[in-house]
Amino acid sequence: NPNGSPLDPHQQQQQQQSQDMPHFGLPGPQPPSSQQQQQQMQVHHQQQQQQQQQQQHQQQMQMSLLPGPYRPHIEEKKLTRDAMEKYMRERNDMVIVILHAK
């Protein structure tokens, strides 16, 4: 059959395409969703970091502002958290940096 040999590579190509298409189609929708999750996690992590930094900063300020008897660590932490929440409420110019993972 003279048509047999030219048809073979063409059929192979079609088979490759049908195998490749699901392979190419799957990663398309997936990365954006995992990217968004990454982004949200990063934002959440950064907000936590910011709060921790503020807590540390305020702890240092309290330590220098409050001479006198040494306060128990737990009480001090509670005070700092209250101060931090008050600070977060009063400050409206908070800047949150969002990193976009590529």
Swiss-Prot record:
- From which lineage does this chain's organism come? Eukaryota, Metazoa, Ecdysozoa, Arthropoda, Hexapoda
Got any disulfides in this one, which pairs?
A: none
Q: Which UniProt keywords apply?
A: Activator, Cytoplasm, Developmental protein, DNA-binding, Notch signaling pathway, Nucleus, Repressor, Transcription, Transcription regulation
Q: What does this protein do?
A: Transcriptional regulator that plays a central role in Notch signaling, a signaling pathway involved in cell-cell communication that regulates a broad spectrum of cell-fate determinations. Binds directly the 5'-GTGRGAR-3' DNA consensus sequence, which is present in the regulatory region of several genes. Required for neurogenesis in imaginal disks. Acts as a transcriptional repressor when it is not associated with Notch proteins. When associated with some Notch protein, it acts as a transcriptional activator that activates transcription of Notch target genes.
Q: What name does UniProt use for this protein?
A: Protein suppressor of hairless
Question: Residue spans with biased composition (Low complexity)?
Answer: 33-64
Per the record, the similarity remark reads:
Belongs to the Su(H) family.
**Cellular component terms (Gene Ontology):** CSL-Notch-Mastermind transcription factor complex; cytoplasm; nucleus; polytene chromosome; RNA polymerase II transcription repressor complex
Q: Name one GO molecular function term.
A: histone acetyltransferase binding
Which top-level group of life is the source organism from?
Eukaryota
What is known about its subunit structure?
Interacts with activated Notch. Interacts with Hairless, this interaction preventing its DNA-binding activity. Interacts with insv (via BEN domain).
**Residue span of region Disordered:** 1-72
Q: Where in the cell is it found?
A: Nucleus; Cytoplasm
In the UniProt record, the signal sequence range is: none
Has keyword Repressor? yes
